[in-house]
Design a protein with these regions (language model features):
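Short, Lys/Arg-enriched N-terminal segments with co-localized hydrophobic residues
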Residues: 1-11
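Active-site donor-binding segments of glycosyltransferases and PAPS-dependent sulfotransferases
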Residues: 86-114
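Active-site neighborhood of HAD-like aspartate-dependent phosphohydrolases
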Residues: 12-54
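Substrate-recognition element of Asp-dependent hydrolases with the DxDx(T/V) motif
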Residues: 57, 62-90, 96
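Acidic, Mg2+-coordinating phosphoryl-transfer loop and its flanking beta/alpha structural elements
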Residues: 121-153
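Conserved Lys-Pro-Asp/Glu-containing loop-to-beta segment of HAD-superfamily phosphomonoesterases
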Residues: 15, 105-133
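Short catalytic/ligand-binding loop motif for oxyanion handling, primarily in non-cytosolic enzymes
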Residues: 25-28, 77, 84-88, 116-118, ...
Length: 158
């Protein structure tokens, strides 16, 4: 058992999960791309807008941070897609492929139970969908000591 622990610590990379909305992806950029009529129609439930996720831009520094973390860690994208918006699931896949490359699509996990994934770190801007119960360290993106990607990289690259 001790040998297995030593093997994992020395040989295997630590696992990092990265959320999409509000962490890799600027959700507000999708809202800004909507017409005024769409904004009024979907007020308070923008995650229900068809194709909303395909209209979003990366957060500042997110692409570089993902690539840098991938050099040191075993990085996965762990996100949630709304149940009532069927296009959200495929939009998220296409966003990952278009912004991070096809190899990253094989590291995309969509789940409403993030706490079921085993890893060392979860970078997420919320505690919902199991993020608050994650067994590793929750890096609360956009809050406190982790307001942006620069602060996350400083912490994880130390």
């Amino acid at each position: 058992m001790v040998l297995l622990f030593v093997f994992r610590e020395v040989i295997m990379k630590k696992i990092v999960y990265v959320d999409m909305d509000g962490v890799l992806v600027d959700f507000n950029s999708g809202i800004d791309s909507l017409t005024l009529q769409e904004q009024l129609e979907y007020e308070g439930r923008f995650d229900k807008v068809p194709d909303i996720f395909s209209k979003m831009e990366p957060m500042i520094g997110a692409i570089d941070a993902f690539n840098r973390l991938s050099e040191k860690y075993d990085v996965y994208i762990l996100s949630t897609a709304p149940w009532g918006n069927a296009s959200a699931w495929s939009d998220k896949y296409e966003w990952v492929e278009g912004n991070l490359g096809s190899a990253a699509t094989k590291r995309l996990i969509l789940s409403h139970n993030k706490h079921l994934n085993i890893g060392d770190y979860l970078i997420d801007d919320r505690t919902a969908n199991g993020a608050g119960e994650f067994q590793g360290e929750h890096i609360h993106f956009g809050k406190g000591e982790f307001p942006d990607w620069e602060s996350v990289l400083t912490y994880l690259e130390a």
